[in-house]
Amino acid sequence: LDPKLVAQRMMGWTDARTMPTAERLQALLAPEDAAAPASGQPYPFFLASPMSGEVHELGSITEWQAEWKWDGMRAQIVRRSAGISIWSRGEERMNDAFPEIVDAAESLPNGTVLDGELLASLPNNLLPFSMLSRRASRKRVGKKILAEIPSVFVAYDLLEAHGKDIRSEPL
């Protein structure tokens, strides 16, 4: 059994609302072909790390890729037959805190997983991380919070398309 598959299945495993059962353990350890990605499980998050070598060791600048460092919360949007889930890198499901993102994700094709950043944003103005954090900590988001601290999702990677894991494919 591929350890990466077990790691993916373990995302959200510690959900306090779900009791451990023999069935959940069997699903965790099931052969790869027996567990199609129909659930809302995200992929393990890969975080950036500081460069350990010298800049000249990176090769030609024409081969480089860079991403903007947003002041938001890393998240994955999972759109599969089981529905839509927004996951934090801390393995928390955040659907209740970001209902407008869930609504927008309805337009994604089934079998899509996006990696990106949740941001608090007014038109033409990103809001501070502290406001996003305040919103994310709420179990229920009312109209006032939706108006004061609207959110957007900036996707920077497509991890799954049409139900196929494409993380190992070239950009």
Enumerate the language-model features and the residues they cover.
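N-terminal nucleic-acid-engaging modules of covalent nucleotidyltransferase systems
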Residues: 1-171
